């Protein structure tokens, strides 16, 4: 399970090191995709397939379904992990999440989120004190 909060820098060539505690749970490649709330997401190939299958089973007759699938699959890419445990984040993906140099890497259980440090700090400031409230609202989903 992916857990923890790590801060790493994107190097001048666009590479980001994957923390060793997260790397041990990943094979030689991951799927990089557009995430929710302005971040990027990393999933193992198997987890991305599981995630994608939820949407593939939905009808293409609905415009909203087609639009989401287009945005998801067009903005997803398999990236290799190099011998130094780094992934290359293409320029268009960095732009998508407004990533500059400093990145916060968040374990989200079944996937990893990559956040621009400023965006993550804003999220954290807005939500940190709402932990109990958010936990209670999750009970409504079951």
From Swiss-Prot:
Show the InterPro entries listed in the entry. MraZ, MraZ_C, MraZ_dom, MraZ_N, MraZ_sf, SpoVT-AbrB_dom, SpoVT-AbrB_sf
Q: Does the keyword Cell wall biogenesis/degradation apply?
A: no
Ranges where the SpoVT-AbrB domain occurs: 5-47, 76-119
This protein's GO cellular component annotations are: cytoplasm; nucleoid
Q: Which UniProt keywords apply?
A: Cytoplasm, DNA-binding, Repeat, Transcription, Transcription regulation
Q: Which Gene3D superfamilies match?
A: Transcriptional regulator MraZ domain
> What GO molecular function terms would the record report?
DNA-binding transcription factor activity; transcription cis-regulatory region binding
| Protein localization | Cytoplasm, Nucleoid
CDD domains attached to this UniProt entry: MraZ_C, MraZ_N
Report the family membership: Belongs to the MraZ family.
Specify the protein name: Transcriptional regulator MraZ
